[in-house]
Amino acid sequence: MQTESSRREAAAATEQLFAANRAQGSVQFDVRAVDGVTRRGKLHESGSLRVRFPSPEQQGLSAVLVNTAGGVAGGDRFSIDIAVGESARLTLTTAAAEKIYRSHGPSAQLDITLKVADDGHLGWLPQETILFDQARVERRIDIELAPRASLLLCESVIFGRSAMGETMRHGRFIDRWRLRVGGKLVFAETVRLDGEIGALLDRPAVAKGGVAVGTALIAPGDSELVERLRENADLFGAEVGITAWNGIAMARFCAQDAARLRADMMAVLRRAAGRALPRLWLS
C-alpha cells in the first residue's frame, strides 16, 4: 500500500521529470522607420524561439516566428515582445501552425506583448494553433496602441485535427486578451475552456459542434469597414459575425473544420488589409 510519503516522493519525481523536459523561448525586438523604410532595431532571442526577416518589402518589414522545439508541451514557457515605432510597418506570421501537445502535468504558458506607436502599423497574422486531446495551455495577449496606430490581428484555434480523425475531448485552454488604445482599455476578454472541452464545444451557445474558431481585430475600425467586410458574406462556409465598437472592428469565425475557417479568415483579412497576405499563408 502506497504511503503518503511515497506519494509525495512520486509526485516530486514526476515534477522533476517535467521540469527537465520543458522548453523555454523568448523573442523581443523592435522595428523603426528610417528615411521612410522600416528597419529592425534591437533583437533578443533565447531558447527555442527564433524570428527571421525575409527580404524587405516596399510596404514594410516582414517577420516569421519559428519554434525550433517543434511544438508546445506541458510546462513549456514562451514569451514574445514586439514594439513597432512611429511610422514603421511590420507584418508577422509563423513558419507553421503551432501544435499544443497532450500534457499530463502543468499547462504551457504563452505570453505575447505587442506595442505600436503613432502612425505605426502591425499585422499580427500567425497561422493556426492546433490543440491535441488533453492539451493544456494558457495564453495572454496584451496590446498597446498609440492613438494614431493601426492594427490587423488574427488568431485561430483548432480543437483536434479532424482531417486526421482526431478529436479533442479533454484539456485546458485559457485565452486572455487585453487591448488598450491611448492607454484606455477598449477590449478585454478571457476564454476559459477547462475539462470536457469536446462537450463544451457541442453546446449551441459555445460552438454548436464547431472545432475551428478564430478572431480578427482591426483598429481603427468603424461601421463603414464592417459593411465592406460583410460583402459577399453569403459565400462564407463558416459562421462569421462582424461588428465594430470603441473604434475597433472585430470578426468572429466558427467552422466545422480548419480548411473552411482558413478560407473565410483569408477572405476577411485580405479585404481588411487591402494587400496580399503573407506567403506562408498560401503554402
UniProtKB/Swiss-Prot annotation:
Molecular-function GO terms, alphabetical: nickel cation binding
Keyword list, A-Z: Chaperone, Cytoplasm, Nickel insertion
Primary site of residence: cytoplasm
Any Pfam family hit: UreD
Subcellular locations according to the entry: Cytoplasm
Superkingdom of origin: Bacteria
GO CC, any one term: cytoplasm
InterPro entries with a match to the protein in the record: UreD
Keyword Chaperone: yes
Subunit structure: UreD, UreF and UreG form a complex that acts as a GTP-hydrolysis-dependent molecular chaperone, activating the urease apoprotein by helping to assemble the nickel containing metallocenter of UreC. The UreE protein probably delivers the nickel.
UniProt family annotation: Belongs to the UreD family.
Classification via HAMAP family: UreD
The protein's role, per its UniProt record: Required for maturation of urease via the functional incorporation of the urease nickel metallocenter.
Protein name as annotated: Urease accessory protein UreD
Protein species of origin: Rhodopseudomonas palustris (strain BisB5)
Gene of this entry: ureD
